[in-house]
């Protein structure tokens, strides 16, 4: 369920703070959101794929931790990011 390199590069270019930035929380959250969306579509077709379901829950937890970190560090960037990605705010 990995993203292809073209889609990954597009996401990195869109959310990067500067050229070559792949480690900022915004980029990581955007990449996780794309992977979560792909896994969600996969699980709609293959309802009994429990190992993928566990992987999805792990990714959601990781994204949740990164969102919490970004919310505490830089709230304006956090609020822009959740609007752009369509993620609900708690």
UniProtKB/Swiss-Prot annotation:
Provide this UniProt record's keywords sorted from A to Z: Ribonucleoprotein, Ribosomal protein, RNA-binding, rRNA-binding
Family affiliation: Belongs to the universal ribosomal protein uS15 family.
Q: Say yes or no: keyword Endoplasmic reticulum present.
A: no
Instruction: List the protein's name.
Output: Small ribosomal subunit protein uS15
Concerning HAMAP family, the annotation shows: Ribosomal_uS15_B
What does this protein do, in the record's words? One of the primary rRNA binding proteins, it binds directly to 16S rRNA where it helps nucleate assembly of the platform of the 30S subunit by binding and bridging several RNA helices of the 16S rRNA.
Q: SMART domains attached here?
A: Ribosomal_S15 (SM01387)
Query: What's an example of a GO molecular-function annotation for this chain?
Result: rRNA binding
Gene Ontology CC, one term: cytosolic small ribosomal subunit
Supply the NCBIfam families for this chain. S15_bact (TIGR00952)
Question: What's a single GO BP term from this record?
Answer: translation
Subunit structure as annotated in this protein's UniProt entry: Part of the 30S ribosomal subunit. Forms a bridge to the 50S subunit in the 70S ribosome, contacting the 23S rRNA.
